[in-house]
Amino acid sequence: MRNWRKTMSAWSFEDMRSLQNKRLRDFLRHQVYPFSPYYKKLLDDNGIAVDTINTTDDLTRIPFTSKKDIAPDEENPARHLQFILIPDEERIKKYASKATLLKLAKAKLMQGETAMRKMLEWEYSPVFVIFTTGRTALPTPFLFTRYDLQVWLLHSSRMGEITKEQVDYQPGQMWVNAFPYAPHGGFWQVYFSTSLQGIMTLQSGGGKILGTERILDAISAGNCTGLIAVPGYLYHLLRKAKEEGRDLSSVRFLITGGERAHPDYREKVLQLVRECGAQDPKFVAAGGFTEQKHYPMECIGGDKVGYHNFPDLDFFELIDPESGERLPDDASGELTYTALDGRGSIVIRYRTGDIVEAPGLDYSPCPVCGLRICRINSVISRRSEMKEMYLTKLKGTLVNLNLLYVVIPTIPEVNEWQVELRKKNDDPYENDEIILYITPQEEGQEETIRNTITEKMRYAMEIVPTQIIFEPLDKLIVRLKLEVELKEQRVVDNRPV
């Protein structure tokens, strides 16, 4: 889309939805239905003619896709492959758009059949892969073609352009990308965004590659204005910087993604960087999920204005997590995603498992950047952390472990923490136990922490921990795997399956 910022700032909601309707129609008819083994079978099995899906409202007729439909397992390790667009000559002739057929015919006429096949190979042959982190299922590969990489570069360039302006980036400044170097999208989104916008960035690879001390050396060298990392590692870096008396006075903003960033967490990391000399630092969170294949973020300087998504690439809806009924955009509900463009691995009506607080989806102009796009409320919890717990032998209790991320960080005496779920005596027929591992801020705070956590958990969650174990920080950092894993191991379920 040319002049995308001008268009997305000036258009009406009706203009935006009209574009999405057209993109959806074209994508389903010319790409998804003919070339996706999974969705062709899904529509055929449910008696849904693809040419009857004309608007985003019509999507409600299509059954949902969830992680269990995609994730490989021992019985079907290749399950994810059925979500890849796989064209063949016959289906291209039958389903491709007139513009595509004309382009292919022209290439064949002017340059020969080899050139035409290379065009198709460029568009459909996978060349890049990232993985889900496997927190709720086995790690799932999502494949990108060169066409997909162009879409990702487009999205990254847009987000980079907005961020670069909002932080007033100047030549000579440097950002530090401390996302882990891995087949995971966070690192690559930052790499693409900064490279395309000409932003000098140390692509450190995180603690596992460059190492925490060297990253801190780079940040404290004097010209680092931005620090980007997953939440747990960002907190670890800043805590370490404070312990070592590092000068971080040049840092002007923090960006985090890959995990939720609750308000208390935001204030904690901002306070840490202020204590290292930063003046009026800003915090911004990025959201998204692997299945989206690119990652939205907030505007810098706004007060949690929501994750920005571009309507020409994605469509979102909210549903009731129990009934599956579509909800109004301003409600609270489970976020459900449909791709409007792409090749490689594609999902339609994908249930993310993320519960978005009201107003879930906001299409009013962003108060910071002015874009009228889909902004997802950044207050999100995970359905996967609603656990069935057998705290007595009589019945199961649904425990919302998302509340731990609200309860524990509000206790000022707590420096670091982890929760382990296990069975009493490791007996699968025994009661469940909730074990908390805590590092106090200072010695002598153990009893205060024990009483406060017990009281807060009883009030907020109607449960109390089975046991609270106090450990030194270095031991808990090892437990959390802060420097060796993509995401910290905050809640560990060690109960037998």
Which sequence ranges carry the predicted segments?
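Active-site glycine/GP-rich loop and adjacent strand/helix microenvironment
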Residues: 1-29, 33, 37-38, 174, ...
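Active-site phosphate/ATP/adenylate-binding loop shared across adenylate-forming ligases
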Residues: 2-6, 66-284, 292-302, 306, ...
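Nucleotide 5′-phosphate-binding alpha/beta core
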Residues: 1-131, 137-158, 221, 432-435, ...
